[in-house]
Amino acid sequence: MKLYIINGPNLNFLGIREPAHYGNTTYAELVEMIQNHAAKLCLVAECYQSNHEGDLVDKIQEAYLQKADGIIINPAAYTHTSIALLDALKSVQIPTVEVHISKVEEREDFRQVSYIRAACQKTITGHGVNGYLEAMDFLCELLSKGEGK
């Protein structure tokens, strides 16, 4: 089983940017956590981060072309603005989980709108970096039941 973990703008600055909201874990540490959890679940996790919307669309399309079984996406600020990401996720029809490190529903009003949620099987918010591991567990369970595809 292969999952694509796609991260949007500023997530490369985890551990630096607003630790009160996002914690002290760096992006490199997050990727290591994901890879360790993937090994326990006997799956391959392809981790990617970009600050550019078109690059994220390209990665979603690559997930389709590479026959990924699932996508975990933290679109960051693009959550609230990107119809392009919504359209890309809808077009590939790969089971997807939206993850946010902070509890976006308790932050500014504009952060409470998610354009991509409509293309996702689940949304996980406010669980810190552990939300990614929860998303991996969810997709493994969903896919092992033969659901989602």
List each model region and its residues.
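N-terminal small/polar loop signature for handling phosphorylated ligands or for N-terminal nucleophile
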Residues: 50-73, 77-93
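Extreme N-terminal starter segment of soluble prokaryotic enzymes
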Residues: 1-4
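Short, glycine-/small-residue-rich phosphate/pyrophosphate-handling segment
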Residues: 47, 97, 106-149
